[in-house]
Amino acid sequence: MSRIKLLLEYDGSNYHGFQLQKNANTVQAELEKAIYRLSGERATIVCAGRTDAGVHAWGQVVAFDSCSTIPGDRWAYALNSQLPEDIQVLESQETRAEFNPRFDALKKCYGYLIYRQKKKATFYRHYALCNTEPLKLEAMQEAAEILKGRQNFRSFCASGSSARTFEREIFHCRLSEKGPCLLLHIAADGFLYNMVRIITGTLLEVGKGKYPPQHLREIIASQDRTRAGPTAPPQGLYLLQVFYPEDSK
């Protein structure tokens, strides 16, 4: 029995998220069907981040166990021959038997894309939040800096979370201009349910002048979800990269 580690990218537009769901098409379901077609095994996929419906990934990490004779570094080629075009395995390798993509992660990086033009966003509608209002970028960046460090982020967690603690450490949170878009890049040791989308919605409120950057301190201190901004839609969110202890060796 070998544990196989995969690095994936996928367009989440046509999926009801990553995780298996009854009577719904998911990324995990497509992967497990492809594994079965190749090896006859009913593998169970474990992932680094269970992305929601409509959310995309450039650097999702998953693992599964297999008794197949397919070499670890050939799983990528084999799976890509069976997967739909909106899911691609970028790399594959055999890894240590105890490797867990979710719990072994040291840091996860997400990006949120905001399209900011007055005209209709025909080609961005499935891949970015479309904003037509002027945004104060300096104010948004000042607010983003306040989020850095280890803090209680309960105000940025959607209801229904199973988290035991609301403390997380944000290593960096910055905004950059990418053509007609604004990219929020955020890295942390972990994220709460809808945390990045709520942070994005809150920073947009700052950018629109709804409240000043320093108001973020009050939102954090309140530990009250109703004090933060709205949850940004899923299509602008991307899982960019996941870091593990072995990556620094």
Curated annotation (Swiss-Prot):
GO terms for molecular function: RNA binding; tRNA pseudouridine(38-40) synthase activity. It comes from the Bacteria. Formation of pseudouridine at positions 38, 39 and 40 in the anticodon stem and loop of transfer RNAs. Substrate binds at residue 110. Belongs to the tRNA pseudouridine synthase TruA family. InterPro entries: PsdUridine_synth_cat_dom_sf, PsdUridine_synth_TruA, PsdUridine_synth_TruA_a/b_dom, PsdUridine_synth_TruA_C, TruA/RsuA/RluB/E/F_N. It catalyses: uridine(38/39/40) in tRNA = pseudouridine(38/39/40) in tRNA. Its EC number is 5.4.99.12. Disulfide bonds: none annotated. It comes from Syntrophomonas wolfei subsp. wolfei (strain DSM 2245B / Goettingen). PANTHER family: PSEUDOURIDYLATE SYNTHASE, TRNA PSEUDOURIDINE SYNTHASE-LIKE 1. GO terms for biological process: tRNA pseudouridine synthesis. Keywords: Isomerase, tRNA processing. Gene3D superfamilies: Pseudouridine synthase I, catalytic domain, C-terminal subdomain (3.30.70.660), Pseudouridine synthase I, catalytic domain, N-terminal subdomain (3.30.70.580). The active site is at 52 (nucleophile). Homodimer. This is tRNA pseudouridine synthase A.
